[in-house]
C-alpha cells in the first residue's frame, strides 16, 4: 500500500497564494505592535512551507505516530506565544525564526517517539541532524524550479522563494506532491520512492515528470499574472 508523504489534507485547505514582500513587512510591523489578527495572518502564510519541511523529516515509520500538520500547529502556537522574542525585521528573518521553532518541535517529538518506540525506529536523533535535514530540505525546495529574472534591486531571497514555492506545491494533487517531496526535497532514488509509494520504478519516474510539469505550470501562472 502506498505511504503518503505529503502534509495531510489539512494543508490543502489553507489559503493559497503567497503575499508580497511589502505585505509581509506590514504584517510584521503590526504584529510587533501587539495586533493579534495580523500576527495570525502572518503565521498562516507560512503554514504550507513549514508543513512541507516537517514532512521531509518523518520517515514512513514515524509518520504512523506523528502528523506534520500537528507539528506545525504546535510550531504556530509557540510562535504566536513568543512573537515578542522575534528580533528580525524582514521576511527572510521571520522564515528563519519559524524554521528554528519547527526544528525544536521536531527534535522533541522525534526524540519522544524514538524513546517510546521499538528497535526498528532510529534510537537517537541529535538536534544537529534535524537542523541539517530541515535546512537541506528548505534549500532543495527553493531550487526546485529555475528562479525568475528579477532586477538586482528586488532580489528573491532563498527563504522567501521556498515559502512561495511551498504554496504552489500544496495546490498539487497528493501523489504529485508526494513524489516531488521524495525526489526533490529528500533526494531519494526512484527505486526507493517506488517502494515508499507502492508503485513500480518506471511508474514513479513518469509520475515525477508529470508532477514537475504541473508544478511548473502552476508557478508560471503566478509569474504571468
Protein language model annotation of sequence segments:
Residues 21-27, 43-44, 63-84, 186:
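Conserved RNAP core-binding helix
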Residues 85, 100-125, 129-137, 158:
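Arg/Lys-rich amphipathic alpha helix in sigma70-family domain 2
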Residues 107, 165, 176, 182-185, ...:
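DNA-recognition helix of helix-turn-helix
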Residues 29-33, 56-63, 74-94, 112-114:
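Sigma70-family region 2
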Residues 17-22, 28-55:
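A short, charge-rich alpha-helical start-of-domain segment used by transcription regulators
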Residues 43-66, 81-85, 169, 214, ...:
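Amphipathic, Lys/Arg- and hydrophobic-enriched alpha-helical face
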Residues 31, 50, 54, 71-79, ...:
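Short, small-hydrophobic-rich alpha-helical interface motif
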Residues 50, 128-181, 188:
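Amphipathic alpha-helical segment used for protein-protein interaction
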